[in-house]
Amino acid sequence: MFSELLKKIVSGQDLAEDETTTMMDAIMSGEVEVPAIAAFMAALATKGETFTELAGAARSMRRKATRIQVSSNTVVDTCGTGGDGASTFNISTTSAFVVAGCGVTVAKHGNRSVSSKCGSADVLEALGVKLDTHPEVVEQGIEEIGIGFLFAPMYHSAMRFAMPARQAVGIRSIFNMLGPLTNPAGANCQLLGVYDPKLTEMFAEALKLLGARKAYVVHGHDGLDEISICAPTRVSELAEGMVRTFDILPEQLNIEACDISELAGGDAEENAGITKSILEGTPGPKQDVVVVNAGAALVAAGVAEDFKDGMAKAKEAIQSGAALGKLEALVKFTQENG
């Protein structure tokens, strides 16, 4: 079956969602040899992935994942694809604490850096969060403090079967896209940054197929896989089962546009310092971009009417100390229970 479907991709035909799921199930069960996995990756990348293929692959990966149960009806993730090459600080990770500071349940999915100096796992580790916390403990932490970090390798062990092929081929493939679509806590509200403007609608449509309630998939025209405050941002909104795409400009949000260099980060230690400084209330462009992104996540969660309302709530969570309190609570909880 795998080889038949591979021939279909090679001939330039798109797969149905269930066909992609079948291929991924075979890969993630260890049934497929490395050369065939490499061929699958390369053929799909050459043809160009569709949103149905993306959803089909994500569905398989979700089924194989170690799941955690969260009692809240609203669970937010701010995990993006990464790979934008912009070398900014960890905007979406910092935003996650602000969202949690507004009383919204956050299950932040993430990993170590692939292409940047510092991934979400790297900065959280530098902040004192224990990464290798058992899923049951993470589940408990989300219930008790309202936020948890889901370190991808702890939940997606079946991905090990694809790793040799990924390392051998060395190209950006469908596997680079699946992280934000495979949250082990089943996050139903997302702010999802992507590395290419062509992916915003594709990811929003995939999230629709996967049953997300509301999501914003974003890409800054300056290349950021976040809502940018340096340039317009392309936004694909999934709401009430419909996807619509629009651009949003910094001035529409009453934010003073800045140069992207003002959002620069560094290694894990430097980025940890930036995150802490923002959550402690230091004003400036770095705090502004976090407020904008957290604000959008709050709209996705249904606790803010629009981006400006979300931004006001995000700013209040920083100024009141609630956002910093969530970081401190997560560090304490993982250190004591990890």
From Swiss-Prot:
Binding residues for 5-phospho-alpha-D-ribose 1-diphosphate: 80, 83-84, 88, 90-93, 108-116, 120
GO molecular function annotation: anthranilate phosphoribosyltransferase activity; magnesium ion binding
Entry's cofactor comment: Binds 2 magnesium ions per monomer.
Phylogenetic classification of the source organism: Bacteria, Pseudomonadati, Thermodesulfobacteriota, Desulfobacteria, Desulfobacterales
Name of protein: Anthranilate phosphoribosyltransferase
Annotated positions binding Mg(2+) 1: S92, E226
GO biological process, one term: L-tryptophan biosynthetic process
Record: residues binding anthranilate 1: G80, N111
Keyword Magnesium: yes
Domain of life: Bacteria
